[in-house]
Amino acid sequence: MATEAPPPVDTTEVPPFTAAETAVKQPHKLERKWTFWFDNQSKPKQGAAWGSSLKKAYTFDTVEEFWSLYDQIFKPSKLTVNADFHLFKAGIEPKWEDPECANGGKWTVTSSRKANLETMWLETLMALVGEQFDDSEDICGVVASVRRSQDKLSLWTKTATNEAAQMGIGRKWKEIIDTEKISYSFHDDSKRERSAKSRYTV
């Protein structure tokens, strides 16, 4: 006796995957890779060379990785006094000696309020990984420094003598972090003098 074939499955009731559901499964790639670094100078070892406390932490290239790392670790509020967080393009070390930084300089803003540093740091990170700067190829990275007297945020660039590029970056950064004034110093000047004079101001 022949068995009856099972009835066909009605697929009209199965909801299709939405674009949003599909997107969740696919990480959102950034335009380039970035690396977080950590530096703690609060307990320097005797005779240690400058920069020896600088440690590479994580390299990432997706939006999801960025937010996970930021939320769990890389907030200035988690830093002790005399410690720094860095976010630099992958392949560039946050040192004057790095070939990409050797002829550069930095825009700097100071803050006496921890909350301000936290906000400016996050706004800067999002602008960097989101490629919001017109002269983004001239940017190396950003450093958040927690100090006893006041905190500091520094945006490092490659070609200090390219005034047009630096002023464009400076104006955009000032707008992003919503501050009154920022100044730019050359790394070469900083090597010679502890408090290097400002070359550009916006």
Swiss-Prot record:
The lineage of its organism: Eukaryota, Viridiplantae, Streptophyta, Embryophyta, Tracheophyta. Disruption phenotype: (Microbial infection) Truncated protein associated with pvr6 resistance allele, correlates with resistance to pepper veinal mottle virus (PVMV), especially when associated with the pvr2(2) allele of eIF4E. This is Eukaryotic translation initiation factor isoform 4E. GO terms for biological process: regulation of translation; response to virus. Residues 1-24 are annotated as: Disordered. Pfam families: IF4E (PF01652). EIF4F is a multi-subunit complex, the composition of which varies with external and internal environmental conditions. It is composed of at least EIF4A, EIF4E and EIF4G. EIF4E is also known to interact with other partners. In higher plants two isoforms of EIF4F have been identified, named isoform EIF4F and isoform EIF(iso)4F. Isoform EIF4F has subunits p220 and p26, whereas isoform EIF(iso)4F has subunits p82 and p28. (Microbial infection) Interacts with viral genome-linked protein (VPg); this interaction is possible in susceptible hosts but impaired in resistant plants. Keywords: Cytoplasm, Disulfide bond, Initiation factor, Nucleus, Protein biosynthesis, RNA-binding, Translation regulation. Changing residue 20 to E: In haplotypes G1 and G2, allele pvr6(9). In haplotype E1, allele pvr6(5). In haplotype H1, allele pvr6(7). In haplotype Ih1. GO terms for cellular component: cytoplasm; nucleus. According to the redox status, the Cys-101-Cys-140 disulfide bridge may have a role in regulating protein function by affecting its ability to bind capped mRNA. Changing residue 24 to A: In haplotypes G1 and G2, allele pvr6(9). In haplotype H1, allele pvr6(7). Its main location: cytoplasm. MRNA binds at residues 46-51, 78, 96-97, 147-152, 191-194. The keyword Nucleus applies. Disulfide bonds join 101-140.
